[in-house]
Amino acid sequence: GWTIFQIPYLSLGYDLERNYFSRTKLSANREFFILLGLFFSLGMPMVFKFSNEELLRYLVYVALLTGLIGVTLLTIFIPEKKIKNKEIGLISILKNMKNNSPLIKVMTVWLINSIANVLPMILFAFFITYVLGGDDFSRQKVLFFYFLFALLGIPFWTLLSKKIQKTKTWSLSLFTSAFFFIFALFLNEGDMVAFILISCLTGFCLGADLIIPPSIQADLTDLHKEKFKEDVSGVLFSMITFINK
């Protein structure tokens, strides 16, 4: 269900904005509110002392209410471009994508980055419990600060992408995040504060990793359309979803 929703949701950024920097701002606004939702969902049990069952119940209520409002506003106020009934074969699309070298390069980097992001996600709970000696509350606290600094980082990376190229901004965030993560190798039991600090620094870099790639993808979709005379924005953004998964 989320895949069905996500592909057109991501490609909306391409349809709504044509300006180079405006696409980054649109992507930043979208990811800001996603992170804000994550931030509040992590903060609720810390502030209100909810049990896991209570938290899940309240989050379901909030998701249903805000989702209904959001989808209603989306269908009413977001304009839909006219669709040209032109059939384009899948083989032709894949062949043209193969000949679009900038697109292949970005998708390759995206794939490597997605794999790199999965490893900490899988090992996170084990690292907190068996290396640092933490508990459930420790995990919530680390994630709370991680997403808090991701929120704070979004304006910085958005403005930086205006000063330098988007690809340079993304590269800088990836190298910076990888550099700070190295220090986690030297942590031992009880070094929770140090790990929270590392999480704050890498969380700050997460902002760029969320907002810059979709904006780059929108620009590459324009390039693809100009070069091959075909609008396959939905297909290209579905490739992103596939790579992320």
Question: What role is predicted for each listed range?
Answer:
Residues 1-6, 192-212, 216:
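Hydrophobic core of transmembrane alpha-helices in multi-pass small-molecule transporters
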Residues 5, 9-125, 129-130, 134:
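Intracellular loop-helix junctions on the cytosolic face of multi-pass helical membrane proteins
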Residues 39, 147-155:
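Residue-level signature of mid-helix packing/kink "hotspots" within the transmembrane helices
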Residues 63, 141-150, 202, 244:
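Transmembrane alpha-helical segments of major facilitator superfamily
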Residues 152-166:
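Helix-to-loop junctions at the C-terminal end of transmembrane segments
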Residues 162-176, 225-232:
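Cytoplasmic membrane-interface "Motif A"-like loop-to-helix N-cap segments
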Residues 175-190:
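C-terminal ends and interior cores of transmembrane alpha-helices
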Residues 228-245:
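A late C-terminal transmembrane helix in Major Facilitator Superfamily
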